[in-house]
Amino acid sequence: MEKKKIVLKNFTEDELKEFMKTIDEKPFRGSQIFSWIYKGAKTFDDMNNIPKSLRNKLEEVSCIGHIDIELKLESKVDNTKKYLFLLDDGNIIETVMMDYDSRVTVCVSNQVGCRMGCNFCASTMDGLIRNLEPWEILDQVIKIQEDTGKRVSNLVLMGSGEPLDNFENTKQFLKIINEKNGLNIGYRHITLSTCGIVPKMYELADLEIAINLALSLHSPYDEERRKIMPVANAYSIEEILNACRYYIKKTNRRVTFEYSLIKGVNDSEKEAKALAKLLKGMLCHVNLIPINKVEEREYEKPDKAFIYKFRDSLEKNNIPATVRMSMGSDISGACGQLRRKYK
């Protein structure tokens, strides 16, 4: 069996310098190669200040790492683009770019599929196929920057997959994306969304890297949450909120609670008041997301009046809340609509 090659995009700059030592090369070559990677080098022969002997050696044991754009869809109603990327093993992942006036945000996937089973989300329908490696998450951002010529300023880990279910690779990706000689995206411009894997939430907090944490809550009641989110069978709302409080304490960052509003399921005045009571005193914000249509599901978004009544009820009880503007829904690129194949 052919030995699997080492993917250089999986390394930080310091790690690449260490890798040079393992192949009997000077560490400074690692910095040169790192620079070439982020200048867009596609092959080792593009690196014209690297000796031919080293390029040949690298060719034998390693590769740079590339995913390919299979398809790009552009929204007709807003500045959203959805990319379908083809991975080396033939799997497909989806990534969304949102071009705002003041920033460019990319929503990356971190798994092929998802095993969390949230029953309003398209990403989980085929289950989990595999985790993405750090470089495969990273290259979504690189390829979008190359395609558009625009610098990505903000990043959300809200595509297919649960980041904390792929924790080690997510953690390494966060180190790489922050590299000053790489893409240099600051931690305060990165948001990680989780459905609440409590032990990993504590581990994330202990990293003390101060990224923004978004918690998919969707109901103030354990019983109701278990019906729409199977992960709720493993962790109660109380356990999740305690982990959120710990995260706030360690990072001094506000936690965002994502709440998908589903008509007749979780959109009543009673639930708004229960949610406000639950979050009282926390450094937090509620992001209300009118459910986006997934053709295999019967869920519907509430009428606009109900949506804003829910928001007003939270704010009346001193819980900051906004209604998220849904972008990319006409290309199935909105929250909950990403999947591992194009339909």
Swiss-Prot record:
Ranges where the Radical SAM core domain occurs: 100-330
Keywords of this entry: 4Fe-4S, Cytoplasm, Disulfide bond, Iron, Iron-sulfur, Metal-binding, Methyltransferase, rRNA processing, S-adenosyl-L-methionine, Transferase, tRNA processing
Binding site for S-adenosyl-L-methionine: G161, E162, S193, S216, L217, H218, N292
Pfam families recorded: Radical_SAM, RlmN_N
UniProt keyword Nucleotide-binding present: no
Gene Ontology terms for molecular function: 4 iron, 4 sulfur cluster binding; metal ion binding; rRNA (adenine(2503)-C2-)-methyltransferase activity; rRNA binding; tRNA (adenine(37)-C2)-methyltransferase activity; tRNA binding
S-S bonds: C107-C335
Keyword Signal annotated: no
InterPro entries named among the record's database cross-references: Aldolase_TIM (IPR013785), Elp3/MiaA/NifB-like_rSAM (IPR006638), Methyltransferase_A (IPR040072), RlmN_N (IPR048641), RNA_MTrfase_RlmN (IPR027492), rRNA_lsu_MTrfase_RlmN/Cfr (IPR004383), rSAM (IPR007197)
E.C. number: 2.1.1.192
GO biological process, one term: tRNA methylation
Catalytic activity: adenosine(2503) in 23S rRNA + 2 reduced [2Fe-2S]-[ferredoxin] + 2 S-adenosyl-L-methionine = 2-methyladenosine(2503) in 23S rRNA + 5'-deoxyadenosine + L-methionine + 2 oxidized [2Fe-2S]-[ferredoxin] + S-adenosyl-L-homocysteine; adenosine(37) in tRNA + 2 reduced [2Fe-2S]-[ferredoxin] + 2 S-adenosyl-L-methionine = 2-methyladenosine(37) in tRNA + 5'-deoxyadenosine + L-methionine + 2 oxidized [2Fe-2S]-[ferredoxin] + S-adenosyl-L-homocysteine
Cell location: Cytoplasm
Cofactor(s) the record lists: [4Fe-4S] cluster
One annotated Gene Ontology cellular component of this protein: cytoplasm
Entry function: Specifically methylates position 2 of adenine 2503 in 23S rRNA and position 2 of adenine 37 in tRNAs.
More about this protein: Reaction proceeds by a ping-pong mechanism involving intermediate methylation of a conserved cysteine residue.
Family: Belongs to the radical SAM superfamily. RlmN family.
PANTHER family tied to this protein: 23S RRNA METHYLTRANSFERASE (PTHR30544), RADICAL SAM CORE DOMAIN-CONTAINING PROTEIN (PTHR30544:SF5)
Protein name, UniProt field: Probable dual-specificity RNA methyltransferase RlmN
Species: Clostridioides difficile (strain 630)
Gene name as annotated: rlmN
